[in-house]
């Protein structure tokens, strides 16, 4: 990868994780809408937003090329399921007062990326990376052993998003085209659920206030912009390097949860957070040291 691609990847990764970090504030505005309904709106409006974006950027030629590779289309169905599950779990967590555990999941995620990069992409661990991963595992095990609880939400978010990033990197599909196909795979299920199954006070857009409908439509922008930045960054950076930036999003989530939404971390969560934070500190220092050494 050349220096220009790396710089682009860094900027795209920073943008993606900053937007994700403050995204819970958006979902809190529509907390009274069921999580499954919000998910359907994310899918539907993301699809139409991508159609408009593809038209403006005149990138339909990429789609024509992609259609000629059925294997990649199938793999995008896999990535669509992974990201759809991640979206649903995240929305539910934020709107059911589990924002802290959601942030924990994205603190764990960079370390999961390191493991997946080693297993599936042949990326080698350095000693300090091994130490960081072991500390993260210890944090989860201590919570399980001492407090009898397991951060299911955190682990679900961490692994679903890590595997999503891995699949997208293996496919190496242009970001916008890949996002369009992913939402296209999810669109029929989302449309059937919203228009034929969902029956809540907010499921009928014709009866909703205009402000609510605008917020629901905005789910397409809130969803696609950071995800496009992420997938574009994933094709320009090593997966382990991409993990370096992922502390930005969960840090913002943690601060939002504690400062604005009154969530208080219990002893079990703080033990796990402590292990993860130490692991991330080691990971970051190792990355900085390695970068300085290789640049000399």
Task: Spell out what each predicted region is.
Residues 128-144, 157, 268-287:
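Hydrophobic transmembrane alpha-helices of multi-pass small-molecule transport proteins
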Residues 45-49, 105-119, 189, 245-260, ...:
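Alpha-helical transmembrane segments of compact multi-pass small-molecule transporters, enriched
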Residues 104-108, 175-185, 224-259:
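Helix-helix packing/entry segments at the starts of transmembrane helices
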Residues 18-22, 26, 77-94, 156-163, ...:
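Hydrophobic alpha-helical transmembrane segments of multi-pass membrane transport proteins
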Residues 30, 38, 93-94, 119-121, ...:
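Hydrophobic/aromatic residues within transmembrane alpha-helices
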Residues 1-15, 48-76, 127, 179, ...:
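Membrane-interface interhelical linkers
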Residues 2, 247-296:
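C-terminal-most transmembrane helix of multi-pass membrane proteins
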């Amino acid at each position: 990868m050349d220096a220009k691609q790396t710089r682009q990847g860094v900027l795209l990764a920073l943008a993606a994780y900053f937007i994700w970090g403050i995204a819970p504030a958006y979902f809190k505005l529509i907390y009274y809408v069921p999580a499954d309904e919000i998910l359907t709106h994310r899918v539907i409006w993301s699809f139409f937003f991508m159609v408009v974006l593809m038209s403006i950027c005149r990138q339909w030629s990429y789609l024509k090329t992609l259609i000629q590779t059925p294997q990649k289309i199938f793999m995008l169905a896999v990535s669509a399921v992974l990201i759809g599950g991640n979206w649903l779990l995240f929305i539910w967590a934020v709107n059911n007062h589990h924002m802290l555990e959601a942030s924990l999941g994205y603190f764990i995620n960079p370390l999961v990326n390191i493991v997946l990069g080693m297993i599936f992409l042949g990326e080698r661990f350095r000693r300090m990376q091994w130490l960081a991963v072991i500390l993260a595992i210890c944090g989860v095990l201590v919570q399980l052993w001492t407090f009898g609880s397991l951060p299911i939400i955190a682990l679900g978010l961490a692994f679903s998003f890590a595997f999503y990033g891995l699949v997208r990197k293996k496919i190496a599909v242009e970001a916008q085209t890949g996002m369009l196909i992913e939402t296209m795979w999810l669109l029929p299920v989302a449309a059937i659920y919203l228009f034929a199954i969902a029956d809540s006070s907010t499921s009928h857009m014709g009866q909703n206030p205009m402000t609510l409908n605008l917020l629901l439509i905005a789910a397409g922008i809130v969803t696609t912009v950071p995800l496009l930045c992420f997938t574009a960054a994933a094709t320009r950076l090593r997966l382990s390097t991409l993990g370096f930036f992922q502390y930005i999003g969960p840090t913002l989530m943690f601060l939002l949860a504690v400062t604005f939404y009154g969530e208080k971390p219990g002893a079990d969560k703080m033990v796990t957070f402590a292990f993860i934070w130490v692991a991330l500190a080691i990971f970051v220092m190792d990355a900085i040291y390695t970068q300085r050494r290789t640049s000399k």
